Amino acid sequence: MSQQFQASSGTGSASLREFKTEHEDLREDLPYSTLRTLFGITLDKDASQALNIALLLYGHNYPQQVVPPERNYAELDAQLESVVLEDHTAESTMEPGVSATVTEQLEEKSDKSSDGDGTSKRLTRSLKSVENETEEDHEEKEDEAPQSSRRESTRLKRKLLESQKTVQTTGNSSRASSKSQEKEVPGTKSQCAPKIRTTPEQSKAATKRQSSTTVRASSTCGSSVSSTSTVSSPDYTAKKGRATETPKLEELAPKKQSSATPKPGGEVCVWDGVQIGDLSAQMNAQIGDDEELDTVDIARRILSELKERCIPQTALAEKILARSQGTLSDLLRMPKPWSVMKNGRATFQRMSNWLGLDPDVRRALCFLPKEDVARITGLDEPTPAKRKKTVKVIRLTFTETQLKSLQKSFQQNHRPTREMRQKLSATLELDFSTVGNFFMNSRRRLRIDQQISRSSRSTGNGADTEDELDEEDVVVENVIADATDASNQPGPSHL
């Protein structure tokens, strides 16, 4: 590469442009040390020439601080300006025929090039460099040039645009052929695509093409992007850029749901390949009055059926028998004889009818929805009894005056007459039943206190006197009389 540079360095800016066109594959961010190594340039002698080539290759944005500090910056700047001016004058004096030949050469190169992406990228970059140079030259001299030069510039621009379009079409065709050969998955893009400077018209056309391709890609691949499957991974195929998935095991498994709504009128319900019709007559059959069922044998058969067929006990209890799981467990664990049983006969009768069905039908009934089983078997679900709303009784509290008056009356007479109680209720503004309850409760508390004191004295003295026994008999008689009187007129209890 150093020999190429030495051969081209003495021929002027035209050879430098050719060198630039041939070596466009160099990166734009190469440091000065890499340039020096590539071109075989020593640090002391040819630093200015390397900087000139860097400016011609990569534009005026190349950092100038990489120049060795022992060089004179003023001399380098003057040399660079002279080289750049020569380059611009050569470009401005280029005739339309020369630019046409350049475009023809580019087209010939694109036709002869292979289908790979590297050739199309180099052609695009070379076309970009020519376009940039012509646009910068015409922008600087647009105000000073005559009308004829402006027309020539517009012609050059049109030719450049046409040549760029042809290069893009060839590049797209080459990319498509390379992708078809490599069998890549659709939707992947090249990460090292070149940055091309385009006009507003070209950018609009590119956005339209991109939107159309994205719509096509979404329409073709939309069906493949479905819910994720935990059973198998998607198996992609390269035919026409479509992705397919292997079927899930859940889709291949039989559907364990009723395909039709079962009704007693004769419609059939299918569950796991088992057809179930109307079973109300078989499930509601009753035995004669003289017959009896062996409850122990029925319980044993039910337990073995649940274990062998893997049927939950809750499903049998709630869907077939309309009972709770706890009730069924008690009946199966301790079955009573048929002659002794009163309330559980209907449950054992239904269990016996269920055991008389086909084994597959028996199991299917336990896995159908509860409403469907009720329709098929004609089961009426028991309705719970409505509880009566109990009114909460507000507890009465005596005032201090009322309590003192009642206690004083009780000390005077433990059993006041009816007229006396009516007078107290009117005086204290209390109900008649409330006054009667107070005297009854007071007598009960007095009796309890007497029993406690008597028991304490008996433990101390060892025996009860006859007077105490007579007094206890009187208290018992009084309590019985008070109870009969209170039963006629009940009321809330008070302390």
From Swiss-Prot:
Keywords: DNA-binding, Homeobox, Nucleus, Transcription, Transcription regulation. GO terms for cellular component: nucleus. The keyword Hydrolase does not apply. Residues 106-120, 149-162, 242-254 have a biased composition (Basic and acidic residues). Pfam families: CUT, Homeodomain. It comes from the Eukaryota. It is found in: Nucleus. Residues 1-14, 163-179, 199-217 have a biased composition (Polar residues). Probable DNA-binding regulatory protein involved in cell-fate specification. This is Homeobox protein ceh-21. It comes from Caenorhabditis elegans. The gene is ceh-21.
